Amino acid sequence: MTTPPVCSYEGSDYQTSFWEKGGRAYEDACEAYALRRLLPTQGEHLLELGAGAGRNTPRYHGYKRITLLDYSRTQLEQARERLGDSPRYRYIAADIYHLPFVEGVFDGATMIRTLHHMADAPLALAQVERSLQPGAAFILEYANKRNIKSILRYFLRKQSWSPFNCEPVEYIPLNFDFHPAAIRKWMGDLGFSIIRTLTVSHFRMGLLKRLFPVRFLAWLDSLAALTGKWWQLSPSVFLLTHSKLDGISAPEGAIFACPACGNPLEDTPPLLRCSRCQHAYPVQGGIYDFRLDPPAGVN
């Protein structure tokens, strides 16, 4: 099956090295502010795309159930260790380009620090849209190529690519920045309505993070975030969107579909087998594995 390349964090200590020991307390606090502003107060079933080790999951307290999805099984193992085996959580190892769900399952979704790994962002977003109920809330974060730093670097001739054209820029392999206009077009083409835009991490500079307390800097950022409805010049942008109202809602109790052929699957752990194409998907250690091409050496 032809698919865009997938960025895998399998075996990575990303949660520890980047978030816990990497000096990212400011960025984490900024994201917490944004989520508090954008999240619905309540919901039934949230899909967290690119959930990683579950850093943001406790912030989704308004939802009764949360499905954590990540390509990396080891990241999900860390999330399960952090969050436990509550019936509220379901852990799914899968590829966003081939989501293992029937149409219209979720009434909410988030994709934070994940789209920037998508070589085919419109295809990934189309898969998300397909999984959402009509009018579902979808919070999308993306890395903004038209930020102040990249604009200054471009005018000073310290970078070759323009922050003003709408094409994504791959600054290192499988790491992309996107233009706000491109994101708006893709979302509009899929029927999403953009309800609110917040700009985030305006003060992502080592000097400022050393000079000012995290809480103060994040509070300033939360004020600057309100300018997002007029302009987007920060390195990170959050959108609250709603899916189209004329979509499909899944039948009661239906959730899984074969990512290889789309046939509905019965939830029958420890193994889910597709009656149409005979693909089999194991459930081990509390994690459903729907990856069509898992990393070598990973069961």
Predicted regions mapped to residue ranges:
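Conserved class I S-adenosyl-L-methionine
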Residues: 1-42, 55, 75, 139-162, 291-299
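Class I SAM-dependent methyltransferase SAM/SAH-binding core
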Residues: 47, 51-98
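A short acidic, Gly/Pro-enriched loop at the edge of an enzyme's catalytic core
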Residues: 97-109
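A short SAM/SAH-binding and catalytic strip from SAM-dependent methyltransferases
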Residues: 108-120
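A short glycine-rich, Lys/Arg-flanked "PGG" loop and its adjoining helix->strand segment in the class I
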Residues: 122-137
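A C-terminal cap/extension of S-adenosyl-L-methionine-dependent methyltransferases
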Residues: 157-160, 185, 196-268
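Acceptor-substrate binding/catalytic loop of class I
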Residues: 161-182
